[in-house]
């Protein structure tokens, strides 16, 4: 299994293999998920004090806050996967 890394802004990098979803923080259920992760000590704030624009939920139950738009993170993720399949057509 290859480790794929995604830049989530300000030099912060997350393992793409561990990402379950990338969502906007605006809805009440997502705000509740953020608060529950904060209470459980599973929240990683990678916003550097800026406004949270994307919430990344990982398979380890960690919740990561990013100041980058969800579309940008998703685009980086899909571009990374596309470049990996282009490099290794034997898979």
Curated annotation (Swiss-Prot):
Belongs to the RemA family. InterPro entries: RemA-like. This is Putative regulatory protein DSY2730. PANTHER family: REGULATORY PROTEIN SSL2874-RELATED, REGULATORY PROTEIN TM_1690-RELATED. The lineage of its organism: Bacteria, Bacillati, Bacillota, Clostridia, Eubacteriales. Disulfide bonds: none annotated. It comes from Desulfitobacterium hafniense (strain Y51).
């Amino acid at each position: 299994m290859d480790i794929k890394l995604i830049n989530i802004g300000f030099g912060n990098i997350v393992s793409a293999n561990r990402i379950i979803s990338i969502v906007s923080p605006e809805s009440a259920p997502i705000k509740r998920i953020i608060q529950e992760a904060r209470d459980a000590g599973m929240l990683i704030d990678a916003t550097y004090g800026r406004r949270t624009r994307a919430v990344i939920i990982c398979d380890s139950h960690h919740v990561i806050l990013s100041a980058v738009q969800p579309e940008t993170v998703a685009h980086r993720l899909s571009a990374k996967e596309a470049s990996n399949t282009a490099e290794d057509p034997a898979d």
